[in-house]
Amino acid sequence: VSDIVVIGGGIAGLSAAARLSEHFSVTVLEREPATGYHASGRSAAMFEQNYGLPSTVALNKASAQYHREANGGYLSPRGLMIIAAREDAEAFDDDVVTMGIERISKDRAVELVPILDPAKFTFAGHHEAGYDIDTDRLMQDFIRQIRRNGGAIVTKAEVTAITRQTDGWQVVAGGQTYDAAKLINAAGAWADAVAQAAGIAPIGITPRRRSMARIPAPEDRDLRDWPMFFGVGESWYAKPDAGALLVSPADEDVVAPQDAWADDMVLAEGLARYEGMVRTPVTRLLASWAGLRSFAPDKALVLGPDPDEPDFIWCAGQGGYGFQTAPAASQLLADLVRGVTPALPHDLVAQLLPDRLRA
């Protein structure tokens, strides 16, 4: 018997469980053989404060100090750059404003990323304040915190039944039975399915695929200090990763919850958009994969107790911002579960509670 069972061992569930383990006995159930298998293990792992809806940006900002300072800090400088062709002037102006980016010369852009082809782009903008997040260490440290506080993490524990009882919940997973007073739904793309299994109305979580290719360092260059660079309106992006380059078509195709894989056609189109801005064609892929970014109907995170069943707590709809927002989102969730007044402003909390999605 635990005070709390958390369903889902990605960054959302692990961070929530870590915070809650300071006050409650916690068990995390993850159906895969390892934690962080789905979206969390496939993330491009950037911390960019100005990225997302206003409520997401507020969570990013509230997470910044933790990312910078906790356990020696998880951030390393990366920077962001946007490049655009002449016909995309208007979209470029929009990006400059939304992302707080400084316009730079074409020459400076080519200094930052030497494979860019100056004949192919007209506008460039750069922003120092984009950082790589050490996602693996962040997850491992939350896991350590859970275990230090006596919590359990059970893998290969696919939930097959959830039953409401007078004093809480009974969950059958991986052939074992778990009893808990409260249930945290941190199941990512499967969050609505978990709700339905528990007899709770779904909230309309939509998984969207995001594909990724890893290509060899173009021209064998040392690209450690390159920024992450984007096409305008996030039509593609590229980012250095362990001596290679990640390139994504920035796709958002709606798919069923699944162990996602990259769509070859979507990947090819995205790589072509990237090639349209650089001198070096893509000749081979080292690897390709996809992850699911899961969104609520209004694209804001869903954090807090279900209005019809307060012992069922949503931790869902991270939409690709799971790592960025984890420190503040998990703290808010723990505050709401404990019944203490959250540190975050009341109007922000209202934009995140599941109540907003119930007519």
Report the location of each language-model feature.
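N-terminal Rossmann-like FAD-binding beta1-loop-alpha1 element of flavoenzymes
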Residues: 2-27
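Short hydrophobic core segments
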Residues: 5-7, 29, 178-190, 330
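Active-site substrate-recognition segment that forms the wall
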Residues: 18-19, 47, 73-79, 189-311
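Glycine-rich FAD pyrophosphate-binding loop
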Residues: 21-40
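Dinucleotide-binding Rossmann-like beta1-alpha1 core, especially the glycine-rich loop
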Residues: 44-115, 121-123, 235-236, 273
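Helix-loop-beta segment of a Rossmann-like dinucleotide-binding subdomain
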Residues: 73-82, 102-149, 250-257, 310, ...
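Helical element adjacent to the flavin cofactor pocket in flavoenzyme catalytic cores
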Residues: 127-181
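C-terminal catalytic lobe of FAD-dependent flavoproteins
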Residues: 276-359
